[in-house]
Amino acid sequence: MLNLVNLFIFFPILLFLHCFFIFLFKKWLGPFGTFYSSLLVFLTSLILTLNELYFILLYGEYFFIDFGRWFFCLDLIDSHLVFCVDSLSLIASALVLTLTSLALYFGIEYMYREAFINRLLYLLNLFATSVIFLFFCYDFFLILISWECIGLFSFLLVNFYSMRIYTIKAALKTFVFSRISDLFMFFTFILSILVFNTTDLSLIFLQVPFFSFHYLFIGNVAVHFLTLFSFCLSTSGVIKAAQFFFHVWLPDAMEAPTPASALIHSSTLVVAGIFLVIRFSTLFEFTVLTNYYLALLGAATLSFSSVTAIFQNDIKKLVAYSTISQIGYLVCGCGFCCYEEVLIYLIIHALNKAFLFILVGYTVHFFNGNTDMRQMGGFYIYSFDIAVLFLGVCLNLAGLPYSAGFFGKEFLLYQLLRDDFLSLIVRSCWLVSFFFTPVYMFILIFVVIYGPKKGLINTYYDFWSFKWVHEYYLLILKGNMLSKNTNLKSVNHQNHLTTYAFQFTIATCRTTTYILVTFWCFFIFFGETFFSIIFNFSTLTDSINSDFFFLFKTHTVFFMNSSSQFLGDYLFSFILFFSTCSFIFLLNLKFTLNYKYLTHLWILDLIFMITTLGLLWSTSTWSYIPFILITTLYFLKFNR
């Protein structure tokens, strides 16, 4: 066990060494070598993370390792290389490693023809490494350095297309707000040195109860020290999370490449800000005013951003304001001291929003780089599987009942069931968000995906090794048409959309689609049960239960029994939705090879659809006989 822990502790250093390796040999590796080496290192680190997380959750342990002093300055700064491996850092690292691996795959596929793709992959590696170092550091000086690195690499990623004037403006705006966040973090670091006389978080947490009545005097004004300390710390985190008054940099930061947006603005960067608040949760138990500040700020953010998202015409800015609104839930939850629920919804949101950014990237590339939703539409005609995934992710983020997004919001909303003036204010803001969140999600669905076709498409061709698949099915299409005595030239013209639909569906999105289906199906249906194991995450000092704020936790969803009606409805909805999705994928396969428009269905297709849906609602075993018969005829006609 100790050897495994030592190996795991060194895996952030392994990530740093890997970044140094690909920087030295970037000309020899090329984009594919950089991609495969990065993917190998991140997947290996992910396996180590999950293995260690299993043992820590099983035995309820944590590991605190001090490698000794590494920086000393005038008896003020005595920094040690201190790392803490607990379930909180492991869960956050597993999330970042998973999404980074997905972003790397999407990045190499999406930007293969772009210039400086090596620089993009290198910056993605450095950014993810900095965030993971932040998760494991247990010394304030190391946290400050990691925080600065995160701001630097996010600025470089936003400024990737540095020849564009709008990109330069967005990068400068990102840099300014990042400096403001770093300024608050540096001021917190100075306070920890002057008052706590240490930068070790374990020693800081041990001293927190003794400073609950400690005041700093600025002239004749007395300021509560822990309130000032927690205010600066939380402000540094909420600026990174793009909350109200500090949100203006995030929509402009969409000038970054789509893989960087999927990694930074949807999951990793906001994870860092919320993680900082959860890590210092012991401190916030003694600072009531800071909790009120976080609750009101998060409530104002989620209501303001949900209303603003409706008036956006740019698809990336709509998703950006959606991210700001959803992070408002997390900040508001931190204000109510329900850190476990925040951690659950953080994972749900990060996974779904990263997948949504990837789907938006495919959509934008499909429409020749156009991001104006008024010129989009009819996307389901060309790639119906991506349209189905788009629908599922948007419904999950909108809070579809029985989905993971619904349960995550329910846990946070349960903390507001108290007759208090602040609770009523926050609840009113949540009601505004609950109304407008499905509205802008359905705008995204019915304008871009299922709306009328208005824009031009991009005949994108895959560069991977499965070109024979496309050529094989293209020959099948030509052979079927030639067998009907049709001119080959007219065949190519008539089946251009069909050929492109297959090309985009099978070649461009093959592995990414399967990954999205797997993760989406798991987290939308079974993720709620899995998240129950992470509630009691271990820390060096136990969180102190406080009666100052709203702390009322009774999660009835986690205690469902097999005979409950709720569980029966839950499983029935899963079977219905999963079977419907399977049917849509099957229909999409047939549409891809034979149809130009989805509305051109055969009679047998309609019978198959009616029989399948009737079977789902029927309890009789005799209904399986026509289902099997119709399915057999369907596949015989399909394979003929």
Model-derived regions, located:
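Hydrophobic core of alpha-helical transmembrane segments in multi-pass integral membrane proteins
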Residues: 14-20, 42-53, 100-101, 189, ...
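Hydrophobic alpha-helical membrane-insertion segments
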Residues: 39-57, 181-192, 391-398, 515-537, ...
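Cytoplasmic/organellar membrane-interface segments at the starts of transmembrane helices
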Residues: 381-386, 447-633, 640
